[in-house]
Amino acid sequence: MARKTPISLYRNIGISAHIDAGKTTTTERILFYTGLTHKLGEVHDGAATTDYMEQEQERGITITSAAVTSYWSGMAKQFPEHRFNIIDTPGHVDFTVEVERSMRVLDGAVMVYCAVGGVQPQSETVWRQANKYQVPRLAFVNKMDRQGANFFRVVEQMKTRLRANPVPIVIPVGAEDNFSGVVDLLKMKSIIWNEADKGTTFTYGDIPAELVETAEEWRQNMIEAAAEASEELMDKYLGGDELTEEEIVGALRQRTLAGEIQPMLCGSAFKNKGVQRMLDAVVELLPAPTDIPPVQGVNPNTEEADSRQASDEEKFSALAFKMLNDKYVGQLTFIRVYSGVVKSGDTVLNSVKGTRERIGRLVQMTAADRTEIEEVRAGDIAAAIGLKDVTTGETLCAESAPIILERMEFPEPVIHIAVEPKTKADQEKMGIALNRLAKEDPSFRVRTDEESGQTIISGMGELHLEIIVDRMKREFGVEANIGAPQVAYRETIRKAVKAEYKHAKQSGGKGQYGHVVIEMEPMEPGGEGYEFIDEIKGGVIPREFIPSVDKGIRDTLPNGIVAGYPVVDVRIRLVFGSYHDVDSSQLAFELAASQAFKEGMRQASPALLEPIMAVEVETPEEYMGDVMGDLNRRRGVVLGMDDDGIGGKKVRAEVPLAEMFGYSTDLRSATQGRATYSMEFKKYSEAPAHIAAAVTEARKG
């Protein structure tokens, strides 16, 4: 099968925003204008196409990023047909892992901001992630029809809060109830969309008299930004020559791809205005797969760096970036193909696990429908059915040319909840459900507590785990009771000590003998967490038993002596010991090492560590005192305060996770729902003595 759409006409884009900026409505309009959906789905009535999981519809927030394929030839059909793969990314802080994962497979992004609320704390998190993956982006200021809408204020906020370099290429005509369209600064004409056909057609008009001066000013700003792309253009501009529309677009594109500027547009998705011009900007200014650098990876056989060009001729390579369970076909694995071609029925290599996988069927998704396809080519995104053992973030590639694309790193979960099935019948189903969900979401973990036998689930926040429990119920029919959230404490040591243990048993026949002397010392926090150094001289412990000493200590790390939490940030030096020709064994040295470690830990002034969260609260000024007082009561340390640019304050603080449970409810009631907050894990630090005592008591109780 030949390629239908040239790779240069592909656009893999993410629509990214904080909650309530109107991202789902924006995505919905994109799908409408690109000819996919005929009835416009509104989030307000729970019918949006990309929010295809039931709970997303209930909560009105987008949780799983669906990859949707659609086509666009321009508002005035001025372009050849382009193929868009739109990846909808979640905007809630508990889902930042999902956002990171989407960023990894995007080529470009559209950041959606609310014309009233502007740049929110969550927007900053997403911006940082886009910087990390060097994603070129446009900004779309939505909700221009709302009371208090102000496009130019958002331009300023992008500069001050995101340290961005926004370059408006349109400006609004009117605002709030009078918002009627935009001025296109390239053509210097107004664009008014036809309300009768929901904005499918439009007319160019003259710029309203009161806007001519403002439009001139912003056009100059845009041309200056374009001229900086090259010396030639700068000379032409400074020489007083007009730059052509083509030159301006080409220069803006060049600088957008380099991450130097972020073109800005505006509109109201709800009122069907502005999204169409933004789609044209995606074609004009965001990258095709061939515009971004070749994807980097590592050859698993040689561990040497390797890369793949975005070309059908290259060997096949793809990244699995999302798992979904589908009622009808089972597991769907979304893959981004970076190079080569893969056909249904092909056998490929999972280079991370070193296993072979057969691609059963391939489907391309529109938000809730799917089309079977025979093959996927470089630069495209599709879902594979029938993969047996592939997890998010793993690479699929041709067996003849193995490569591991970037290993994605996921943060450690910070919150645990015990779950128990309501009935015996639910027990087995719950195990299957949790394992499937863990496969979809690497930031979610499942384990069994050895002492209590309870199933413990861990995740990135309360909402994250609430949604997991909710999905178990809906998708797998498992009813479960959940315990109170628990904090992922850790233990460590505060001083260096020397410890020794001799394990000697004689009980008729072969005895057991292992003797180790270790030195323990605290390590820099946040590093590897554990380091083992063999300093045995003169063979006092034979070589073959050294790994057993390491293993004995490693096996003891998960259960510390303060309150049974995992031990971190310790360095162990094995300095001396002895052995017995007959009675020494690997097991004897494991046991000796384990006991020596426990003994050493008791002497090394052990401490309990608790997770500290970076918390940002945006609040109207009149609630400032209450918010600060509440954070102090929660043992928070306020690091600073800024104006949020819209008459309120932004408070930055570090607060122990243990004190943050139920915070969203408390904050809502204290500020009549007007304050918002975001939090992410920052670091572990030592818990105060009274907290450590209470935690220890609770564990032993």
Curated annotation (Swiss-Prot):
Binding site for GTP: 17-24, 88-92, 142-145
GO biological process, one term: ribosome disassembly
Compartment(s) where it occurs, according to its Swiss-Prot or TrEMBL record: Cytoplasm
Coiled coil: none
PROSITE patterns: G_TR_1, G_TR_2
Cited CDD domains: EF-G (cd01886), EFG_III (cd16262), EFG_mtEFG1_IV (cd01434), EFG_mtEFG_C (cd03713), EFG_mtEFG_II (cd04088)
Entry-linked SMART domains: EFG_C (SM00838), EFG_IV (SM00889)
Example of a GO MF term: translation elongation factor activity
One cellular component term from this protein's GO annotations in UniProt: cytoplasm
InterPro entries found in the cross-reference section: EFG_II, EFG_III, EFG_III/V, EFG_IV, EFG_V, EFG_V-like, EFTu-like_2, G_TR_CS
Entry keyword set: Cytoplasm, Elongation factor, GTP-binding, Nucleotide-binding, Protein biosynthesis
Source superkingdom: Bacteria
One Pfam family from the record: GTP_EFTU
Domain tr-type G: 8-290
Family membership: Belongs to the TRAFAC class translation factor GTPase superfamily. Classic translation factor GTPase family. EF-G/EF-2 subfamily.
PANTHER family recorded: RIBOSOME-RELEASING FACTOR 2, MITOCHONDRIAL, TRANSLATION ELONGATION FACTOR G-RELATED
Entries under NCBIfam families matching the protein: EF-G, PRK12740.1-5, small_GTP
Biological role: Catalyzes the GTP-dependent ribosomal translocation step during translation elongation. During this step, the ribosome changes from the pre-translocational (PRE) to the post-translocational (POST) state as the newly formed A-site-bound peptidyl-tRNA and P-site-bound deacylated tRNA move to the P and E sites, respectively. Catalyzes the coordinated movement of the two tRNA molecules, the mRNA and conformational changes in the ribosome.
Protein name as annotated: Elongation factor G
Organism: Neisseria meningitidis serogroup C / serotype 2a (strain ATCC 700532 / DSM 15464 / FAM18)
